[in-house]
Amino acid sequence: MSTTTNKKPIRVYVDGCFDLMHFGHANALRQARELGDILVVGVHTDEEIAKNKGPPVMNEQERYKAVRACKWADEVAEGAPYTLTEEYLDSLNCDFCVHGEDISVGADGKDVYEGIKKSGKFRFIKRTEGVSTTELVGRMLLCTKDHLQNVSGEQTSPLGGVNPNVLHKQSPYTSLSHFLPTTRKIVQFSEGRSPKPNDKIIYMDGGFDLFHVGHTEALKQARALGDYLIVGVHDDRVVHEQKGSNFPIMNLHERVLSVLSCRYVDEVVIGAPFSVTKDMIDSLHINVVVHGDDQVVLGPEGGVDPYKLPRELGIYKEVKHTEGLTATEIVKRIIDNRLQYEARNRKKEAKEINFIEQSN
């Protein structure tokens, strides 16, 4: 007789702000999910974040939706407390809490997981090097985007006069670092499911920079049109040619991992061509090509419509933009509140350094 048939599922809890939800967050959820059967994700309110850390870039409703779109999140606990208690963990029927190696300090300067650690219901997971919300805000504030310099040969930043020393590099958790892409990470994020012979295959492409709820809602609609969703992610040069200025904020590998973490996505074409070609349609067995209902940006070579062929074949469809959010809008939020976010990053780092010094 098997002893596993009536085994109680292990419920794992992880919490956070999940501001500017990125592949580092997704990787934490992936690792946490591997430790049990059901992953419950607690997301803090705007008020809690402002009190303990500084103002979030994305509001709580946007952050709740972003977490729900991650394929490793089974349940979302909205309005989770910033300082976790054993009572709250028990109220969710969770067996233990998981957090990265980086420290999390509350408004009082104390470790927010201190009580849970003492209770023995705490597990560590590895932090994803080279990406954090603070780091992404730093890129937008200081334009420390090596990948963009390589694409365009120059920086064209509206914040070109910002002092690069505004964000210090002393805390190991709040430094500007570099994500090193590996094939293993792509495999870990990939679904690994192949389309079935009779599956209706949907294709949607784009830059997917600063992957946000506007993207996930569009992908959800696209996936509903068929059985298998393939997403084409444009390379850095294509995104820069179309968006100009400081885009993309995130490089190709970072954007690919963000898209792969989405529960509506089955497969990703890395560095997809700007125009949808006959070869692509034939080789990927595409039945429907999807784009948002915003204006299609024409290609640089004589103003070519990238969806000309799908339109002619009668396989082109549009989905509604329901969120009204773009990467440009997110960057604008940062720039409009630049001083607030610079202060937030400094405050966060200062608390971390102080905590490290007191712990040593």
UniProtKB/Swiss-Prot annotation:
GO BP: phosphatidylethanolamine biosynthetic process
First-tier enzyme category under EC: transferase
A GO MF label: ethanolamine-phosphate cytidylyltransferase activity
Annotated pathway: Phospholipid metabolism; phosphatidylethanolamine biosynthesis; phosphatidylethanolamine from ethanolamine: step 2/3
UniProt-annotated binding residues for CTP: 207-208, 215-218, 243, 291-294, 321-325
Protein's UniProt keywords contain Lipid biosynthesis: yes
Keyword list, A-Z: Lipid biosynthesis, Lipid metabolism, Nucleotidyltransferase, Phospholipid biosynthesis, Phospholipid metabolism, Transferase
Cystine pairings recorded for this chain: none
UniProt catalytic activity: phosphoethanolamine + CTP + H(+) = CDP-ethanolamine + diphosphate
Entry EC no(s): 2.7.7.14
Protein name: Ethanolamine-phosphate cytidylyltransferase
Pfam families from the UniProt entry: CTP_transf_like
Superkingdom of the source species: Eukaryota
UniProt entry tagged with the keyword Transmembrane: no
Record-stated family: Belongs to the cytidylyltransferase family.
InterPro entries given in the database record: CCT, Cyt_trans-like, Ect1/PCYT2, Rossmann-like_a/b/a_fold
Protein's job: Ethanolamine-phosphate cytidylyltransferase that catalyzes the second step in the synthesis of phosphatidylethanolamine (PE) from ethanolamine via the CDP-ethanolamine pathway.
GO CC annotations on file: cytoplasm; phagocytic vesicle
